[in-house]
C-alpha cells in the first residue's frame, strides 16, 4: 500500500511538473521588431519572435524563431496584412518597389526550399498574389532550391535569384531572372541568365 502511494505521488508530481513546464513555455512573451520600411515610410513589417531562439549575434531573426509576420501602417502600427499563417519564416529582407505598391519576400520552407511571395497594394489594402511556382526550370533533377527576390527593376517587374542543387552530386546552378506581373497578378518571365554552374563537390 505504501509503495502504491509512493507511485501515485510520483506520478502526480511528474504531472504537475510537466504542466508547469507547458504553462511556462506558453507564457514566454514574444519580442517584436519593426523593420523593412516602405520607401514612402507609410508601411513596415513587424516580426513577432521567440527571443530564446535568437543566435548570440542577434543580428537576424531565424525563421524557426518567427511567430508572427504582419504588415503594419505607420505610425499607427495598425495591421494592414497578416501573413503569420504562411508556412515557414521570413528569409532575408522584404524588398519594396520604388512606388511602395509592391513588396516581395522569401519564405524558408525547411532546409531544402525557399520560395518567394509577392504582395500588391490596391488602394489602402495589400493583397497576396496567388502566384504559382515563382521560378524557372534550371535544367536538372533538383534536390534543393532557394528562390529569393533581389530588387524591383520597376514597379511590377521583379528581379530574382534561384539557386538549385541537383540530385546525385550533379552540381548546382544559379540563375537570375526577371518577371513581370500583369493586371490579374499572373507573372511572365521576361529575362533569365545563368550566372553560375558548378559541381557540388566544389562547395
Question: What is each PLM-predicted segment?
Answer:
Residues 1-7:
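N-terminal secretory signal peptides that target proteins for export/translocation
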Residues 10-22:
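Bacterial N-terminal signal peptides
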Residues 19, 24-37, 49, 125-131, ...:
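Acidic, small-residue rich beta-repeat scaffolds with periodic aromatic anchors
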Residues 27-66:
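Beta-strand-rich domains and repeat architectures in extracellular enzymes and scaffolds
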Residues 55-69, 111-119, 167-178:
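Structural motif
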Residues 78-95:
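Blade-loop segments of beta-propeller domains
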Residues 95-116:
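Mid-length scaffold segments of soluble, non-membrane domains
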Amino acid at each position: 500500500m505504501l509503495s502504491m502511494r509512493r507511485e501515485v505521488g510520483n506520478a502526480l508530481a511528474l504531472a504537475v511538473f510537466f504542466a508547469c513546464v507547458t504553462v511556462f513555455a506558453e507564457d514566454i512573451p514574444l519580442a517584436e521588431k519593426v523593420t523593412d520600411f516602405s520607401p514612402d515610410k507609410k508601411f513596415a513589417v513587424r516580426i513577432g519572435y521567440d527571443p530564446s531562439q535568437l543566435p548570440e549575434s542577434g543580428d537576424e531573426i531565424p525563421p524557426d524563431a518567427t511567430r508572427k509576420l504582419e504588415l503594419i501602417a505607420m505610425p499607427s502600427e495598425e495591421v494592414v496584412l497578416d501573413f503569420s499563417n504562411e508556412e515557414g519564416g521570413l528569409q532575408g529582407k522584404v524588398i519594396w518597389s520604388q512606388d511602395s505598391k509592391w513588396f516581395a519576400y522569401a519564405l524558408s520552407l525547411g532546409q531544402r526550399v525557399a520560395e518567394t511571395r509577392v504582395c500588391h497594394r490596391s488602394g489602402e489594402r495589400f493583397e497576396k498574389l496567388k502566384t504559382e511556382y515563382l521560378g524557372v526550370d534550371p535544367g536538372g533533377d533538383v534536390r534543393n532550391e532557394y528562390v529569393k527576390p533581389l530588387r524591383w527593376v520597376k514597379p511590377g517587374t521583379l528581379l530574382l535569384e534561384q539557386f538549385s542543387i541537383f540530385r546525385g552530386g550533379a552540381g548546382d546552378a544559379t540563375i537570375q531572372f526577371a518577371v513581370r506581373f500583369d493586371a490579374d497578378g499572373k507573372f511572365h518571365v521576361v529575362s533569365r541568365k545563368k550566372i553560375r554552374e558548378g559541381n557540388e563537390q566544389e562547395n
